[in-house]
A protein has these predicted regions:
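Active-site-proximal, Lys/Arg-enriched surface segment
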Residues: 40-42, 70-126
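Gly/serine-rich nucleotide phosphate-binding loop at the start of the catalytic core
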Residues: 1-84
Length: 126
């Protein structure tokens, strides 16, 4: 699939996350370039089913290069911790969730047997 521009629902979500982030930290919003880059990366992740700069470049038919995409990720001062909090707030607000409890239950997934040299890796605590 060819990516000419980010999906409209992804762009709307990124805008909502940016607004939610600016409510808590007025000076820490995303720039237009950061919003465009983030929307492209989220759209490319949905389209390619992977997080791979080379696949993103191929999907955009060379509009974005691997070097430019990875440079933006490594050098842009994106407030990842604030974006995580803001995105969770946007998702909860959009789905009308006002209260609840978070329960993480991973007891049905046995640990991977690929790491042989780590002590107590396979010991399960119930």
């Amino acid at each position: 699939m060819i990516l000419a521009k980010p999906a409209p629902f992804v762009s709307a979500f990124i805008e909502a996350v940016d607004q939610a982030s600016r409510q808590d930290h007025p000076n820490a919003g995303l720039s237009a370039i950061q919003r465009t880059w983030l929307a492209f990366c989220v759209t490319a992740t949905l389209v390619t089913h992977s997080i791979c700069w080379a696949r993103f470049e191929r999907a955009s038919l060379g509009t974005y290069s691997v070097a430019a995409l990875s440079w933006m990720f490594r050098h842009s001062k994106l407030p990842w911790d604030q974006l995580l909090v803001a995105s969770v707030r946007v998702i909860l607000r959009d789905h009308g969730i006002t209260s609840g409890s978070l329960v993480i239950d991973d007891t049905d997934n046995p640990r991977s047997k690929s790491a042989q040299k780590l002590a107590y890796l396979y010991k399960r605590r119930e």
